[in-house]
Amino acid sequence: MVLLLLCAGIASARQPLRFKDGKFKMVQFTDIHWDPKSAGCEATEHTIKSVLEIEKPDLAILTGDIVTSDPALEGWKSIIRIFEEEKMRFDVTMGNHDAEYLDKQTIYDLLVKSPYFVGSHGPKEIKGCGNHVLPIYGSKQSDKVASLLYCIDSNDYPETEDLGHYDWIHFNQIEWYRDQSKNFTAGNGGEPLPALAFFHIALPEYRHLIGKKTTWGRCDEGDACAADVNSGMFASFVDCKDVMGVFVGHDHDNDFLGQEKNIVLAYGRVTGKDAYGEFIRGGRVVELYEGKRQFDTWITTPEGKEFAYYYPSGITSIDEEGPYLPAQKVQPKKQGVAYTYYEGEFEQTADMYAGKKVKEGVLSNFNISEAPAKDYFGYDFRSLIRIPEKGVYYFYVSSDDGAKLFIDGKEIVDNDGSHSLKCVEGKVALEAGFHEVKLLYFESYMGESLKVRMVGRSTDKLISDDMLFLPE
């Protein structure tokens, strides 16, 4: 009986990765820093097994600096044993310290012997080891790939110190990724498949997130310790349009995440007891949605779950705690937007009221195309917006020149001042129903534009005519 159960477990591990009931969950463990001689291994193993027990994922991905002391071979056997005991399929990407104790080829020779390891050595003709892509198949169509996981070696150190401290993802690796992406896209009728990427060292673009109000989590390192050379991996992710999120480790005192060019750049949570840093040890969970460019992610430790971040909206479970603006007690009958049109030379939206009031009227939306003047004019738009469901919403106002958006009298977006085309966002928690919306806009000279977009957990659209109603 025991043998039959063992064989059944191994057979299940060798099945293709597949969505279940429309979801696929994985846990990223990073910077385990396993030292076979250390008593800290017991705590590290407890962390891994506790997170697996809490989350019960479909896959674990280890993103580098896994075994970082001798005897390394025994250390890797211990790591493999943990996941085999848990009957958990797992994958591995290399960190900059892993090959200091055992060469990468030998590491992968050992890994592929485990029936629970789903990765591979990767192509020999490109830089690094373990570059591969994992297809995740749909829950209903057994032969249809629904999503992709790219596992990439971010390499170790450059050939000379004048190139910086850390190596980078090389051109032939990027070319390999682009070929894989192109082929999977072609096989999906020309539509890029939703994908994630996992490796060890952060891309230089992670630095763009530091200090932004839309970035969540901690940057206790004070920086993203990336390569000095930017080889263009991120630009290829943008160009190929499949990767939704990138997940790395390396910087133990960072666990922040945010979006750059509509791609999430995220750190995992340091896992190993013997790694430096004060964070509670744990793992980052990522849950994909079948057939959608959507995922949720959060950190889980033996002490429990931390806040969740929802892609693509950028909304978090902290946002959802409120407070929420209550809906107006109105039942408007007519759709539309009331406006007052002004002319004059303005530097701020507030300057409009000192200008010449030319006319008033009703439009179907926030539309400036019917302005009588080409330059030097402004609009005061007023409407009731129908919010379909209670939730947190981002409002994006793209304007040339200035604009301000208010909901229920509260300033949500400040894109004021004379400037070229620029997009500014703001967020607000709203009860379902009607809310007063006021949009101020002015045009100075040389180009005019105004667009308003609303993004919620299940909404991403330009505000449409059927959402707007005339105030009573």
Question: Which residues make up each language-model segment?
Answer:
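Hydrophobic h-region of N-terminal signal peptides that target proteins for export
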Residues: 4-12
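Binuclear metal-dependent phosphoesterase catalytic core
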Residues: 20, 29, 133-137, 143, ...
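Extended active-site neighborhood of metal-dependent phosphoesterases/phosphodiesterases
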Residues: 14, 77-190, 284-290
